[in-house]
């Protein structure tokens, strides 16, 4: 009985070894290699990768796009952005003296990029941020501009902000937004177009002002004086 168990165990052991070696040989000879020999080889990062935030430059003028508006520093949830600036006495514009990001505490949340109104920040693809000295993880203005050159381009001079170039919601409120205005807003936000004839549903606090504005427009079209706010034309004339 003991001899039988010995040969049985030996057979199962040999079979498992041969099976394992067969899998290893098949993976080695007939499957593509997935090992990356870093740092000689590097995989491409996906487009949505978030690396160190860097500053972009207008390659047409050679000037950096940052205006020191402080929006990114205010949006940062961990306060890793430091901005120092002074005002040019001639142009009255802000001039950036220092723009630093402490990458030892940055959480790569992308809030600074989303908050920037001038598209001067971008999340770069640089991921090799290991440093021996933690103080070297503070990237200064020149470092961020140098790293951001690969993401910069020559900007065409655009027109000044006008009624047509500014997002529609800046000029149109809920009470006077037309159907075309609402469609423009949805197109600006990348949303699908609304069905034809769509009308916005006003909140209760906006309904009465909207009704009064509509009555005033109708009265003006009919050649009648507009009623005072809170009164209809009938109440103004003394009718019950």
Swiss-Prot record:
It catalyses: a quinone + NADH + 5 H(+)(in) = a quinol + NAD(+) + 4 H(+)(out). Coiled coil: none annotated. It comes from Symbiobacterium thermophilum (strain DSM 24528 / JCM 14929 / IAM 14863 / T). Residues 198-211 have a biased composition (Basic and acidic residues). Its cofactor is [4Fe-4S] cluster. One of its GO terms (cellular component) is plasma membrane. NDH-1 is composed of 14 different subunits. Subunits NuoA, H, J, K, L, M, N constitute the membrane sector of the complex. The lineage of its organism: Bacteria, Bacillati, Bacillota, Clostridia, Eubacteriales. Residues 57-86, 97-126 form the 4Fe-4S ferredoxin-type domain. This is NADH-quinone oxidoreductase subunit I 2. Residues 215-230 have a biased composition (Low complexity). Keywords: 4Fe-4S, Cell membrane, Iron, Iron-sulfur, Membrane, Metal-binding, NAD, Quinone, Repeat, Translocase, Ubiquinone. InterPro entries: 4Fe4S_Fe-S-bd, 4Fe4S_Fe_S_CS, NADH_quinone_OxRdtase_chainI. HAMAP family: NDH1_NuoI (MF_01351). The gene is nuoI2. Its main location: membrane.
